[in-house]
């Protein structure tokens, strides 16, 4: 039985994880929602640089530890970092065109892709209850898309309908690419971690460090670095605040990694997955609160169904873990029962 002190000791890491997750999503949405913002690669390069500086600083104070830079490890990990660049870039482009509730709900589809990827490449298993949660995830995404299109077109004059539809189509394209690359990143990283033996902090350090040159090159080659475009992306009246927000979002990435490890260590992976499912509700609500995302029956229903799907998924994974644990225990033959 847990006493009150044990219960209350688990509250801070859970709250910190939720706050870090909400802050990161809201700040990223704020940065990319500028009327003329187009320098996503530069944004991500700054975030990764801040992240590496923060992690190195925290390591220097002895709060965390991870292995020092090694060229062989870097070569082995570079494909994973490149995949991460595509994940973060497509995610930022999705947020640029889609509302936070829609983005949050559609991220659930990545779980389905990862689950069946694990079935194909790692001998994973999808239980009946897990499949039910997947059905609800798909339904919530369909409701979100319907609500998003309806609210985007309602009240639009005929001349602007084509532009609204085009913007939504671009947003859903980036969301699809983001789901595919996110699943590929997670599955490839799982395989690579077994080869390199990386810890969570090792992965974070190498991911961000190796992504900096890639992002910098893409930014220089693809993006317009002319003074006029820089002025549009970083207006003089909001430049300081915008750069501070970008730096803060990079630090928030470190916060999410730390609070994730803290939450899993002080509670359990099951509690963490449940918190992640429940946290989708305040993340979606933050978009409605801070960015004026449409609060309609469809949008609220989509968030509710997605919220329920997350809970069902967390329960399904918990049950599956317990079942697999029992099967492993049953497979162990006691020494006293073995025949000579």
UniProtKB/Swiss-Prot annotation:
Residues 28-36, 99-101, 147-167, 224-240, 293-294 are lumenal. It is a multi-pass membrane protein. It is found in: Golgi apparatus membrane; Cytoplasmic vesicle membrane; Endoplasmic reticulum membrane. Involved in the import of GDP-mannose from the cytoplasm into the Golgi lumen. The lineage of its organism: Eukaryota, Fungi, Dikarya, Basidiomycota, Agaricomycotina. It comes from Laccaria bicolor (strain S238N-H82 / ATCC MYA-4686) (Bicoloured deceiver). The keyword Endoplasmic reticulum applies. Residues 1-6, 58-77, 123-125, 189-202, 262-271, 316-340 are cytoplasmic. NCBIfam families: nst. Belongs to the TPT transporter family. SLC35D subfamily. InterPro entries: TPT_transporter (IPR050186). PANTHER family: SOLUTE CARRIER FAMILY 35. Keywords: Cytoplasmic vesicle, Endoplasmic reticulum, Golgi apparatus, Membrane, Sugar transport, Transmembrane, Transmembrane helix, Transport. This is GDP-mannose transporter. Homooligomer.
């Amino acid at each position: 039985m847990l006493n009150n002190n044990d219960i209350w000791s688990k509250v801070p890491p859970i709250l910190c994880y939720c706050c870090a997750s909400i802050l990161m999503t809201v700040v990223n949405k704020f940065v990319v929602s500028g009327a003329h913002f187009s320098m996503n690669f530069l944004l991500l390069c700054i975030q990764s640089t801040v992240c590496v500086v923060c992690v190195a600083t925290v390591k220097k104070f002895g709060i965390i530890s991870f292995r020092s830079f090694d060229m062989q490890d870097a070569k082995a990990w570079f494909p994973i970092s490149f995949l991460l660049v595509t994940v973060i870039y497509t995610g930022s482009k999705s947020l640029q065109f889609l509302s936070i509730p829609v983005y949050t709900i559609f991220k659930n589809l990545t779980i389905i892709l990862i689950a069946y990827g694990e079935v194909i490449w790692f001998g994973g298993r999808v239980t009946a209850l897990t499949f039910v949660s997947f059905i609800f995830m798909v339904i919530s995404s369909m409701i979100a898309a319907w609500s998003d299109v309806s609210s985007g077109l309602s009240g639009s004059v005929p001349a602007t309908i084509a532009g609204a539809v085009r913007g939504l189509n671009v947003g859903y394209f980036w969301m699809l690419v983001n789901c595919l690359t996110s699943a590929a990143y997670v599955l490839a990283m799982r395989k690579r971690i077994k080869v390199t033996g990386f810890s969570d902090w090792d992965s974070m350090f190498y991911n961000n460090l190796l992504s900096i040159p890639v992002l910098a090159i893409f930014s220089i080659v693809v993006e317009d670095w002319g003074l006029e475009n820089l002025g549009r992306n970083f207006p003089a009246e909001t430049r300081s605040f915008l750069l501070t927000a970008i730096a803060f979002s990079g630090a928030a990435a470190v916060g999410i990694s730390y609070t994730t490890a803290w939450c899993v260590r002080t509670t359990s992976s099951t509690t963490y997955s449940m918190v992640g499912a429940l946290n989708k509700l305040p993340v979606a609500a933050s978009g409605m609160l801070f960015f004026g995302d449409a609060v309609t029956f469809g949008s609220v229903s989509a968030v509710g169904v997605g919220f329920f799907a997350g809970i069902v998924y967390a329960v399904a994974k918990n049950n599956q873990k317990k079942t697999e644990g029992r099967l492993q225990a049953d497979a162990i033959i006691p020494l006293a029962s073995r025949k000579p």
